[in-house]
Amino acid sequence: MANDSAPRVSKAVHRPNETCTAIVADSEVQSLMWGEMNYRWPQHENITVKFIDGTEEQHKLAWKRFQKIDEYVNLTFVFVDEGDSDIRVSFAEEHSHYSYVGIGNRSVPQNKKTMNLGLKVYDNDVEWDRVALHEVCHAVGFLHEHQHPKNGIPWDERKVINY
């Protein structure tokens, strides 16, 4: 049975110019739906976003992707410079990108990041769209399609990861 109080993290290992194939490494994933209702934000919610490191240019490039998703959901992303925030974005060079899923972001201590975008200003727009839009969708509450319990695909996770 899923532990509804535990925040979920979606993590993708960064392999330039490849699509995300990583999955939530979580034994509870079978109980989740693509957009898990328990992790979706309340409708019309203001979701505060803070950049905890990175350059001004990285902030602009990332914020552009938050605004793009903002157009399609009935949520509003609000940038904050200081104080508490719902989503805390880092640009750490971890060779991975990840985000907590939906309101799971609020379970993370304020001194910890909830999203990592290992992107640089010299990465092209296609890469910024591919990675940042993907992670912002996780922050909204969406999971990967292959994690839907009714996908009917018998995944061999080890083979997929080793591919």
Region locations from a protein language model:
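Zinc-dependent metalloendopeptidases
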Residues: 1-163
